[in-house]
Amino acid sequence: MTATAQQLEYLKNSIKSIQDYPKPGILFRDVTSLLEDPKAYALSIDLLVERYKNAGITKVVGTEARGFLFGAPVALGLGVGFVPVRKPGKLPRETISETYDLEYGTDQLEIHVDAIKPGDKVLVVDDLLATGGTIEATVKLIRRLGGEVADAAFIINLFDLGGEQRLEKQGITSYSLVPFPGH
């Protein structure tokens, strides 16, 4: 099933836009409204599974927290394992971490050291691509463990915030179902 214009429009219309959230001047794209619509949620998963079903993916990695909501069902659809990337202190076994910059400060992500094997072909899934900092850190974790990042897939791309370009500089192609301006 290749995504049709009608299907993509349905997904776009299922995502609510909230003015001045979380602060004045921001137009927030709320993917939780898509999750509330079982048809839209299933369609988003089905379209991603269809796109990657013959790509040789061996693992799907999702970033905390909404990346879990899309990455885990995509992994099931592809018949491969799902690997969560989390904030510090949330994973029980041995981890490695990667620090990345935020607008005002830094944050950190962790992955289990045994979650990715050398040669794994990995699809990174998250709900939204904005500046790309979180996904760039996720890619670095995967590569440190010997994994190959095949692609990064998103439900929403805030295309004017530079995330695609940032990932391209890391050699990562990205795919999104619904493009929106970032402001």
Curated annotation (Swiss-Prot):
SUPFAM superfamilies membership: PRTase-like (SSF53271)
Keyword Phosphoprotein recorded: no
Gene Ontology BP annotations: adenine salvage; AMP salvage; purine ribonucleoside salvage
Class in the EC hierarchy, top level: transferase
A Pfam family of this chain: Pribosyltran
Presence of keyword Transmembrane: no
Keyword tags: Cytoplasm, Glycosyltransferase, Purine salvage, Transferase
Compartments reported by the entry: Cytoplasm
Gene3D superfamilies: 3.40.50.2020
GO molecular function, a single term: magnesium ion binding
EC numbers for this chain: 2.4.2.7
Protein's job: Catalyzes a salvage reaction resulting in the formation of AMP, that is energically less costly than de novo synthesis.
Subunit structure and binding partners: Homodimer.
PANTHER family registered for this protein in UniProt: ADENINE PHOSPHORIBOSYLTRANSFERASE (PTHR32315:SF3)
HAMAP family in the cross-refs: Aden_phosphoribosyltr
Name of the protein this chain belongs to: Adenine phosphoribosyltransferase
Organism, as annotated: Escherichia coli (strain K12)
